[in-house]
Amino acid sequence: MSERIDQSVPDAARVGVVSRIGGVAGLPADDQPPIPTRRRQSFRRWFADKGWRHVVAWIAIAFALFPLLYIVSASLNPIGTLTGSNQLFSAISPRNYERLFTDPAIPYGTWYVNSLIIAIVTSVVTVLLCALGAYAFSRMRFRGRRFGLMTLLVLQMFPQLLAITAIFLLMIQISDVFPAIGLGTHAGLIMVYLGGALGVNTFLMYGFFNTVPSAIDEAAKIDGAGHARVFFTIMLPLVTPILIVVGLLTFIGIIGEFAIASVILTDPATQTVAIGLFQLVSGFQSQNWGVFSAGAILAALPVMVLFLLSQRYIAGGLVSGSVK
């Protein structure tokens, strides 16, 4: 006959059930095991371990925020001078912002629209042309392919500003033959910007295209799809992060560009925000830093909005595009 199994609840002291106050139920207070306590770390050890990182982070944040606070304070200060803006937010008035759109001597609205048109058109065309070039280098095999890639790398070493004199002389010659894309036109400036942006961005996209498995487009070609269909319907959706990154970086670089735009755009009606704001503070007796600060803040708004909307694509696009 089998032994009867005891199904009663075991004694708490026998199994060592831990009570809510940290002791063992059923044991005398003197026999309770000691409760482990966390040893307090000294300030010197904490600072050597991780505290210095907090200090460096706060210094970096202060270093980045102070210029922003200063320019916001200057834009709200009706005095319009740098000496009057030494004390942050000592006076607050929307007068500088009103002057940007009410003063006939400051066509800020025209400058703003010109900058947006040039930046948007250049960004869109740059993304399209760079994507086409990157797809060709990544998926096609043709004579001169390696030489073309090396040329793109070499072109990245020379900034576009080095050729500003040659660009000016070339645009004068183009104006005699094709006035629509010559000196003083938006189309001419866009062409100059495209020439400087295609090299580095094509190579950046080329690295991202290489991360897409070639079996995907090969399967589409077996089903009868051509290069155009593979590119527009399959590849472009897969490389969306790098397209957004290239478009955003191009837009940021152009919306505030001054040196080349000041050489190409000689007509005041075609000038951009960067040129117009420079004119506000270039005069010896007519400097108005308050209006300049207000215009600079408004010019930065599109960049901030685009960056916030596309920030989740930036890290992935840059990391994947940097790997060949």
Give the label of every model feature segment.
Residues 53-324:
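A structural signal for multi-pass alpha-helical bundles of membrane permease subunits
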Residues 1-57, 286-289, 311-324:
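Transmembrane alpha-helical segments of polytopic membrane transport and secretion proteins
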